[in-house]
Amino acid sequence: YPVILLTLLLLASCKSKKNMVATLPRPVLNSDSIYPDTANAIAGLFSPDHSQLKELNVSKNKKQNTKKKTSTDTHESSDLVLRGTKITSSSVDVSSVYTGVDRVVKYDFTHRDVPEAFEGFRIAFISDLHYKSLLKEKGLNDLVRLLIAQKADVLLMGGDYQEGCEYVEPLFSALARVKTPMGTYGVMGNNDYERCHDDIVNTMKHYGMRPLEHEVDTLRKDGQQIIIAGVRNPFDLGRNGVSPTLALSPKDFVILLVHTPDYIEDVSVANTDLALAGHTHGGQVRVFGVAPALNSHYGNRFITGLAYNSAKIPLIITNGIGTSKLPIRVGAPAEIIVITLHRLTE
C-alpha cells in the first residue's frame, strides 16, 4: 500500500491542480442497454486520448484564460430520457477563488412528476465534510460563501460531518449561515454513528436544521409538494433494510437522501424518483480514473456522478468535500452539487 500511495503521489505531482479536476462520467446508453458501460466510464473517461473526454474538455484557449477569478467552463456529461426523466450536467471550476472546494457540479433534472410549482427549484447538496480533515476553518467559511452564492431553495447534507466531537458546534454554527427558503436537511454517515451522533442531532436541531433518520418531510409550495426522505444508518440493514420511501405515494416526487450509494441497490427504494449519496469521496485518490481503494462493495459502479440501480432509479453521487484517513485528494475534486428541477412536459 505505501508503494501504491507513493506512486500515486508522484503521478499527481506531475500534474497541475486544474488538470487534476476530473470531469463527470458520461453514461453510455443505447436502445438495448439501460445502464452505463462501467468499464468505459471508469477506465476510459480519464484517459487523455479518450473521445468522450475530448467532448467534455473545454478548448485550449478557454483553459489559458487566467483573467477570470472563477472559471465558467461547462462540461456536458449526459443527456438522456429514461422513464420520463431527462438529466444533463455541467461543472464550474471554483478552485481559484474558494479554499477547500474545487468545483460546483450542476444538474438539470427533468422529470414528469415534478410539480409545476417546483419548476426551477434549486437543491444544494453537500456531503462528507469530515471537518477538520482536509477542510479547515477558512475552507469552511469559503464553503458557506459558495453555498450562499448558489441561491438554493433547500440545502441537503449527506453525512460524515466531523472528525471529532469538538468540531460539531463550530461546523453547524457556520453552516447555519446558509439560509434557504425551505431549510436544511441531513442524514448521518458512518462516522456520525461511530461518534458524536447525539451531539450532531441536537446541534442540528438547535440551528433549525432537520435530521432525517428513516423519516420523511414534505416541502410545500403553492399548494403542491415534493417529499424528502432520509435513511437511518444504511450500513445496518437488519434495522434499516426497509426504505422509508416504501410507504409513500408513487404520484409524489420523492428525493431519497442516504449516506452510501450501496443502499439503493441493497434494498428496494420503490417510489424514489432521485437518490442522493456520498460516502465514496469519488475514490479520494484516483489516477486516470483508477482508485486503489474503493469503499463501495459494488466497485466502480457507484463511485461518482450519475448512476442507476437495477430498478433504473437515478442516483447522484458526490465526491464530497473532506477526506478520511489521509488528508489528500487526487483526481477526485472536492465539490458541491446543485440540482435544478424541471417538469417534463413532452
Language-model features, listed with the residues they occupy:
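Conserved beta-sheet core of the metallophosphoesterase superfamily
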Residues: A176, P261-T340, L344-T345
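Beta-strand-turn-beta hairpins that frame and shape the catalytic cleft
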Residues: D102, H111-A124, M209-R210, D217-G230, ...
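Short beta-strand/loop segments at the ligand-binding rim of alpha/beta enzyme cores
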Residues: L246-L256
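Active-site metal-binding loops of divalent metal-dependent hydrolases
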Residues: S127-Y131, G159-Y161, N190-N191, E215-V216, ...
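Acidic, histidine-bearing metal-coordination/catalytic regions of metal-dependent phosphoesterases
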Residues: C14-R122, S133
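Extended active-site neighborhood of metal-dependent phosphoesterases/phosphodiesterases
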Residues: G84-T85, S91-S96, D108-T110, F172-L237, ...
